[in-house]
Amino acid sequence: MIEVLLVTICLAAFPYQGSSIILESGNVNDYEVVYPRKVTALPKGAVQPKYEDAMQYELKVNGEPVVLHLEKNKGLFSKDYSETHYSPDGREITTYPPVEDHCYYHGRIENDADSTASISACNGLKGHFKLQGETYLIEPLKLSDSEAHAVFKFENVEKEDEAPKMCGVTQNWESYEPIKKASQSNLTPEHQRYIELFIVVDHGMFMKYNGNSDKIRRRIHQMVNIMKEAYRYLYIDIALTGVEIWSNKDMINVQPAAPQTLDSFGEWRKTDLLNRKSHDNAQLLTNTDFDGPTIGLAYVGTMCDPKLSTGVIQDHSPINLLVAVTMAHELGHNLGISHDTDSCSCGGYSCIMAPEISHEPSKYFSDCSYIQCWDFIMKENPQCILNKRLRTDTVSTPVSGNELLEAGE
């Protein structure tokens, strides 16, 4: 029997009350310093994989011991996952990196039925977990002591901008024929739908992260890790099938007017991207500050359409959880989901499809979202999300000099 890896966090907690530290998540007050110490319990002589399928972390939060259970988020990437960027002279360069042994996990806190966790273990521990109804973030501290991490409540991150942040969608998808409402109790694994998601990063965001493509890719992977967890409630499985970074220049006119940017991005996807890479839905991440309070926009009820199965999202926060929720929101519109009303509920939290982003982040879809999503799926039956792809999609005879790294090359 394979023994589960046990990792113990030895907590050296030094709350810096009233002081501030600058982390990737922003300026943070009142945090604790923790020192992860890995203790394995694998059989003697066993080869330890780089990233185990299951892990446990013991730590203290606010002086109380907790046990964090983590499982690798299998299926996070499609089998033909690709990454594309552009050389300074504009050549398209596409690679197919190995991603099976990745470092992204979902989890829960022991003895807390409502807890969730989304953690990257790539370079230290980075992510968030919900404990007793409160959201905590964890990330490595940039100190000479490489083992030091910070743990802090989401509410202790200083807000850069108190202005409201909203989705720009105003219309709803309406079914023209009455259909039987879906309920979670009568859905089975046969109803599962699969979305192969492609994410494009504009040149402004590339420059925002100082041209660090690795940092951008990690951020995107962490976001999709969060989205995949959220969509499980809707019986929808998300796999990231590709990332394209406009490292040389923008391929469309990215402008503050979100509707025009969305229209241009949809046309580009239809005429360019789909000819190079098969996928079900594409989202554009941009550093452009959209007009007004808008931070995202998408077409409603358009999943699988060559132009309209798209959305545009402003990279509006250093906290990847908030941007991930925004992308999950816009993808929800593509699936026919409207904004929540006061009668919608997701267990007392602000829900993903709220028209305005909440200062208390939520990873939960409401009961209204569930019904609307399956109304759309059963009425429109979008074909592209019926089955997950089981084979590599873009395989050709290896040819050197075309800047495309094919399978086998």
Swiss-Prot record:
Signal sequence annotation: 1-20
Any one Gene Ontology molecular-function term assigned to this protein's record: toxin activity
Cofactor note: Binds 1 zinc ion per subunit.
Propeptide: 21-189, 390-409
Keyword Chaperone: no
UniProt domain Peptidase M12B: residue ranges: 193-389
Domain of life according to the entry: Eukaryota
Pfam families tied to this protein: Pep_M12B_propep, Reprolysin
Active-site residue list: E330
Binding residues annotated for Zn(2+), in chain numbering: H329, H333, H339
Annotated binding of Ca(2+) 1, by residue: E196, D280, C384, N387
One GO CC term, this protein: plasma membrane
SUPFAM superfamilies associated with the record: Metalloproteases ('zincins'), catalytic domain (SSF55486)
Sequence positions that bind Ca(2+) 2: V399, N402, L404, E406, E409
Location, primary (coarse class): secreted
Record field: transmembrane: none
EC number: 3.4.24.-
Keyword Glycosyltransferase assigned: no
Tissues and organs where the protein is expressed, per its UniProt entry: Expressed by the venom gland.
Record GO biological process: proteolysis
PROSITE patterns (alphabetical): ADAM_MEPRO (PS50215), ZINC_PROTEASE (PS00142)
Protein's cellular compartments: Secreted
Entry protein name: Snake venom metalloproteinase BITM02A
Organism in which the protein naturally occurs: Bothrops insularis (Golden lancehead)
